[in-house]
């Protein structure tokens, strides 16, 4: 940290952290798997960065979204998360300096690119600095514990599209409602 400060180097250097983790994984003879070792060192580096400066990372919120999960997977737990209600707000937060970085979905394996993110990247001076491949698992939840009582399905539009075949096969009669995030859908389901 002192050396970085003396030379005016940025606190977060993802390429350098990746080099260190890669070298540690190559030298690893066990008993930990490489992914476990990487996760441990990512948290050590995150905590070390926080001693220099606690970084704020904007993401598509609220808390509990895949974007939040991706943010902590990439930056570690020692950052301050800033949930934003829309992709536009994530970009605005970083552009205005309210956040040091932003995490937004760019693509997924079923629906392809997230067009709003690409539109914002074209309009913004911000650039992509890294990526996280995040396995996504969707769950259909009901407070009653049985699917017989489900009257509507709320989810983010992207998730509804990803699950459309399964939903059509199992619940063709139910109304589907797109909401701002899957976390918001869970909140709505818990209120029903």
Enumerate the predicted regions with their spans:
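Domain-level signature for soluble enzymes in the chorismate/prephenate branch of the shikimate pathway
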Residues: 1-192
């Amino acid at each position: 940290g002192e050396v970085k400060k003396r030379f005016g180097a940025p606190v977060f250097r993802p390429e350098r952290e990746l080099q260190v983790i890669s070298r540690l994984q190559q030298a690893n003879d066990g008993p930990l798997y490489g992914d476990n070792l990487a996760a441990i060192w990512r948290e050590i580096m995150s905590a070390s960065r926080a001693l220099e400066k606690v970084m704020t990372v904007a993401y598509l919120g609220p808390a509990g979204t895949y974007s939040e999960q991706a943010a902590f997977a990439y930056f570690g737990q020692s950052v301050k998360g800033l949930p934003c209600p829309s992709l536009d707000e994530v970009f605005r937060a970083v552009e205005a300096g309210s956040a040091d970085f932003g995490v937004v979905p760019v693509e997924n394996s079923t629906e392809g690119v997230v067009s709003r993110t690409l539109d914002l990247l074209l309009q913004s001076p911000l650039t992509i600095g890294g990526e996280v491949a995040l396995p996504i698992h969707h769950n259909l939840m009901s407070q009653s514990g049985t699917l017989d009582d489900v009257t509507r399905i709320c989810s983010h539009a992207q998730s509804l599209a990803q699950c459309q075949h399964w939903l059509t096969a199992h619940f063709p009669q139910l109304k589907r409602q797109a909401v701002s995030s899957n976390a918001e859908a869970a909140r709505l389901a818990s209120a029903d």
